[in-house]
Amino acid sequence: MEFPKDFTAREKALLGDRFEELYTYATAQPARGVTVNTLRCTPDWFAAHTDFAAEPSKFCRTAFTTAADFRPGRHPWHHAGLLYAQEPSASAPAALLDVRPGMWVADLCAAPGGKTSQLAAALQGQGLLLANEFVAARAEILRQNLERMGVTNAVITNEDTANLAKALPGQFDRVLVDAPCSGEGMFRKEAVAAAQHSDALVAHCAELGAEILENAAALLAPGGVLVYSTCTFAPAEDEAQIAHFLAQHPEFSLCDLSGCGFGRPGEGNRAPDHPDFHAEYTRRIWPADGGEGHFMAKLQKAADAEMPSQPKVKPPKAAKPPAEWLEFARAYFPALASRPLAGAGEWLLLPAPGSEGLNTAKLRVVRGGVLAGSVLKKRFQPAHALFMAYGADCTNREELTLADSRTAAWLRGEEIDAATAQNGWCAVLVDGFPLGGGKVSGGRIKNHYPKGLRNLQ
């Protein structure tokens, strides 16, 4: 491949003799990998049971490198939410955020959902995750991926980050900004990234990233931590971006990432207008380091920073549980029968715990919890999302394995024989992990796996 001329001129000037190293690795085969969803299993369990080659990655304990020609999207474990296809170094920013159960976390540029699913896994169902995506079509992809991964405590929004900052000031312990960028780290994976590259694009992305970073700062609570990342080499979007932000925000300090165990230090010559900026505290992952090209900076807000005034939040009124839902839940998901419900048109929703404290009245909320289902003709019709989130707890289950021929048939949308599940609704699982739900009658399970998700080839 050929680098864009403006990119080549800039990087030759900045890298000198090291440019040849960049060129050599950037023209090699792109790195491939998966991230393991610890809401489903541990990395050790995955490593011990996987049926495809996967080596642990240095970028994150849940990331694995796979063969360049491996495509996980058709694997049953992918359908069951154990895996997210993600080149290994892309897992680093979420890992650096150091999310712990019980925190409130915001991912401001969340689609398609790889890093978001990592944050959700780190929360382990405790605390709250705000997953935002500005582009509506991408927000829908984000919703589908979080549903597949079995995330129960996420509120997904389709908003400008300025609106989030106004509605939810100072409310989050952790904020991730994986900023929209010029994508220079994607050149060897996507030819269109190189074809569309220009200095004007870099300038536009730097301006957009600065705006999002400002809004992220407003969302962060005193003492909270923010990670800013890109998949580009452009100084204006990376070192210079963070240096300028810190110059404007004395309440923030730059955390030293030199001990993170991967990549290389950021470079001061990429922020020449800020001689006091500790570029070496930031982190770069070059193609030679086993990734595609990432930049990361970790910032902490002072504990004594001013806490903004909080808007008054009127808790949403809980929906009265329909008798049909209660009958269904008590039969198949007893622990859910006492959970509060919210109405979402004709659908019923199990709200994300804690979301009643979010000021979302004027925000575009795509999904605020787990879609439970709807009442049709005086019967409760469960949603696919319900089985993906809670299928392992269903009282009526059909257990499959990778080697079971019924697994492939199920993912093609076919009816399968019921070996253990009794008449009525049942969860279908592979190796103990949900693959959706179906309805049993006469020893056969009618397939309710969504048509758009099936392995049809």
Stretch-by-stretch model annotation:
Residues 137, 173-214, 231-238, 263, ...:
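Mobile active-site "lid"/loop adjacent to the S-adenosyl-L-methionine
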Residues 123-124, 220-222:
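Helix-to-beta-strand junctions that scaffold the AdoMet/dcAdoMet cofactor pocket
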Residues 132-169:
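S-adenosyl-L-methionine
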Residues 100-101, 165-178:
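A short acidic, Gly/Pro-enriched loop at the edge of an enzyme's catalytic core
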Residues 172, 225-228, 233-349, 354:
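Class I S-adenosyl-L-methionine
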Residues 102-111, 130:
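Conserved class I S-adenosyl-L-methionine
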Residues 112-125:
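Conserved SAM-binding loop of SAM-dependent methyltransferases across substrates and taxa
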Residues 1-47, 292-295, 300-457:
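Polybasic, low-complexity RNA-engagement segments
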